Amino acid sequence: MRPRSALRYSLLLLAFAASAAIQAQPKTLAVCTEAAPEGFDPARYTSGYTFDASAHPLYNALAAFAPGSATVIPALAESWDVSADGLVYTFRLRQGVKFHSTDYFKPSREFNADDVLFSFQRMLDPQHPAHDLSPSGYPYADAMQLRDIIERIEKIDEHQVRFVLKHPEAPFLADLAMPFGSILSAEYAGQLIARGKGDELNSKPIGTGPFVFTRYRKDAQVRYAANPDYWKGKPAIDHLVLAITLDPNVRVQRLRRNECQIALTPKPEDVAALRQDPQLTVLEEAAMITSHAAINTRHEPFDDPRVRRAIAMGFNKSSYLKIVFGDQARPAIGPYPPMLLGYDDSIRDWPYDPERAKALLKEAGVAPDTPLNLYISTGSGPGGNPARVAQLIQSDLAAIGIRVNIHQFEWGEMVKRTKAGEHDMMLYSWIGDNGDPDNFLTHNLGCASVESGENRARWCDKGFDEAIRKARMSNDESQRVALYKEAQRIFHEQMPWLPLAHPLMFDAQRKNVSGYRMSPMSARDFSRVKLD
């Protein structure tokens, strides 16, 4: 070979080797998230921040929602049958599904019916050995009164289970697709309980999902590795990092510097500038969200509906929407967004009328300068900057004689304090989990949810509760619509919440990211993401 040809050949070999080395480098997706997870057992929590770090990357449920929709599709159950009376659900389980293998657990078997029974019976049976591993109970199961819905769960064989209900439950399949229905390993839980380390079920998670838990640095980041045995196929990325970044400005800065490839929920006012950046893409979703302020109806004088209506009429919602969201949200009038079944568009919002609000407060015997303790979280989510929203409420209510004291806490601390009922008012954004109105109503406003602490308004109206109970049990859509409209009318008169907005949701990503899709239920799925 002549020297020049040999040199050219050597250069080609080096170029090929370099290209192969680049392709072989592990691909890591870093996502800047809004808050730290409270734990890693989805049945114990209700926060989307927690589900982003637990249910979605680590677990699967029997059913799932089709990407970008609320349509229920098979997951760990490959198919099911429902009896004509709506009382018996028979699930055929997917075979060949493996649980995660880690340094702290090596499964000896594949997913089967025992795991389904364990995952649900621990929530339903107070005598179950794993029941008390969650000191605060199981908020979804408790608020939805799952014990009053499910008569029993039967193992037919290794790959079939049967749920027998006490009465028909219209959203039951959609409920099972929610994060609280994530399936855990009965084998792993049994080993932990036997060693007296049951708490590790919440800190060292084992699931069947697309990513395997690696480690958590509290309030900083969560790390995962791609699951090589994932039943849908190994994800295209090798590692996933959730970088906890409370400040939305910092999330955007980190995205621009390529420290994160996806930044969740940038501020609505930043969206236009982000769209002008040639390195970035902005994703938008008309999500199922109601941002609101829950009013504690067990605290005087807020136990009087006249006072709650006065608060509604004393708040300039139009100004709030412009300041916080620009044109990126519509006003909320009721408890759930217009896209859901039975939304009553005939109900008109309470008008902004400070003078009428003052008259109502006087009629109710409320003294001028009455204090109201408003609890908010740090950071910023789909409901905008909590501190800014709180300041607007504070300013408007001061004009009608209510002195708002703002108390700001880290997310988990605020959740704990408001479950205990410390607050007079709490800022919150509820994102629908299953595309059914019941998810907004029973969980957040039902009487049973007062006891579980999930009903932050601590409001129990028997007429409202009966309407949503009947709607939940009916498979007649027209009947459900009528009942939900009745419930909305009661809500509007009683005003346990100050409904604020139905915001659009935004995420931003770098141009080299593909395969990420937002969900109307705000479920973040990174298993399909590719980095170019």
Swiss-Prot record:
One GO cellular component, as annotated: ATP-binding cassette (ABC) transporter complex
Any one GO molecular function term: peptide transmembrane transporter activity
Signal peptide: 1-24
Keywords for this protein: Peptide transport, Protein transport, Signal, Transport
InterPro entries: Peptide/Ni-bd, SBP_5, SBP_5_dom
Pfam families assigned: SBP_bac_5
GO BP annotation list: dipeptide transport; protein transport
Keyword Signal assigned: yes
The protein's assembly and partners: The complex is composed of two ATP-binding proteins (DppD and DppF), two transmembrane proteins (DppB and DppC) and a solute-binding protein (DppA2). Five orthologous SBPs (DppA1-A5) are present in P.aeruginosa, which increases the substrate specificity of the DppBCDF transporter.
Record's function text: Part of the ABC transporter DppABCDF involved in the uptake of various di/tripeptides. Shows high flexibility on substrate recognition. Efficiently uses tripeptides.
Family: Belongs to the bacterial solute-binding protein 5 family.
Protein name: Di/tripeptide-binding protein 2
Organism: Pseudomonas aeruginosa (strain UCBPP-PA14)
